[in-house]
C-alpha cells in the first residue's frame, strides 16, 4: 500500500518490482469525478484483460455482500505484516528506470546549459511530485506549475473533465503560458498515465495529438 496518493504508473511499476500478484488503483482517471472507480493490474504490471475483468465481475456477483466479504483491521494487519507500506526505495527505482529510458543522450548538466522552460499542470491530481522530480533530475529545472491545479482535489474544480488531450482541461495552463512564455506546456491527467502537450503557434497555443508526439519522439 502506498502511504500517499500516487500515480498509476508507480502502482504498475511496484507490482512488478515487488513481485505482486496484482494491483489496484482507486481513480477516476481523466473522467469526471463522479466516475471514480478502480483500475486493476495483473502480475505483469499491465491492466487486466477483458477476460480477467469478466472473471472478477463474475466472482463479485457470486459473493454475498453481507456475509461473503472478508475484512481485517488495518492497524492489526500492519502489525502482523499482512499489510505493508511501499517505501521510498521503490519510488527511487522507478525514477531511475524512467530516466534510463529517456530518448535524450544528454546528461542533466548538459540539459541545464541549454535550459528548457516549462509550464506544467497535474490537473489537481497525483503527478506533481513524480513529474517534477524526474524533470529536475533530467536537468529541466525551470518549471512553473499552474497554481490553481497544483494541489490534489478529487472534485477537479478547475475543469470537470480533466483530460489533458482536450483544450478545456489545458485552458488554465494556456492562460499561464501567455504570461510566462514557456517553451512547452505539459499536463498530466489526475492519475498521471496520460499527458497533454501544447506549443506556441502564432498568437495561440496548439495542442499536439498523441500521434504527433509519437512522430516527434521517433524523429528525435
Give the residues covered by each predicted segment:
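Short glycine/threonine-rich loop-to-helix capping motif typified by GTGT followed
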Residues: 13-17, 126-133, 199, 206
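Amphipathic alpha-helical transducer elements in NTP-driven molecular machines
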Residues: 8, 50-53, 211-215
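Short, hydrophobic alpha-helix immediately C-terminal to the catalytic nucleophile
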Residues: 12, 132, 215-219
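N-terminal small/polar loop signature for handling phosphorylated ligands or for N-terminal nucleophile
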Residues: 1-35, 137-197
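Generic secondary-structure boundary/loop-capping signal
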Residues: 2, 32-38, 45, 120, ...
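Gly/Ser/Thr-enriched, mixed-charge loops and adjacent short helices
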Residues: 36-176
Amino acid at each position: 500500500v502506498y502511504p500517499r496518493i500516487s500515480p498509476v504508473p508507480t502502482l504498475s511499476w511496484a507490482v512488478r518490482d515487488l513481485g505482486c500478484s496484482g494491483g489496484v488503483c482507486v481513480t477516476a482517471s481523466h473522467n469526471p469525478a463522479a466516475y471514480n472507480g478502480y483500475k486493476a493490474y495483473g502480475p505483469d504490471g499491465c491492466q487486466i484483460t477483458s477476460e480477467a475483468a469478466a472473471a472478477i465481475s463474475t466472482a463479485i456477483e457470486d459473493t454475498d455482500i453481507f456475509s461473503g466479504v472478508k475484512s481485517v483491521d488495518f492497524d492489526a494487519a500492519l502489525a502482523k505484516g499482512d499489510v505493508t507500506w511501499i517505501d521510498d526505495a521503490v519510488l527511487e527505482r522507478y525514477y531511475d528506470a524512467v530516466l534510463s529510458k529517456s530518448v535524450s543522450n544528454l546528461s542533466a548538466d548538459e540539459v541545464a546549459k541549454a535550459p528548457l522552460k516549462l509550464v506544467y499542470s497535474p490537473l489537481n491530481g497525483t503527478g506533481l511530485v513524480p513529474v517534477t522530480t524526474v524533470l529536475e533530475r533530467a536537468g529541466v529545472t525551470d518549471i512553473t506549475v499552474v497554481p490553481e491545479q497544483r494541489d490534489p482535489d478529487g472534485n477537479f474544480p478547475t475543469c470537470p473533465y480533466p483530460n489533458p488531450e482536450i483544450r478545456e482541461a489545458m485552458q488554465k495552463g494556456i492562460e499561464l503560458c501567455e504570461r510566462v512564455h514557456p517553451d512547452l506546456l505539459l499536463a498530466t491527467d489526475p492519475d498521471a498515465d496520460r499527458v497533454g502537450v501544447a506549443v506556441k503557434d502564432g498568437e495561440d497555443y496548439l495542442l499536439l495529438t498523441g500521434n504527433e508526439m509519437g512522430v516527434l519522439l521517433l524523429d528525435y
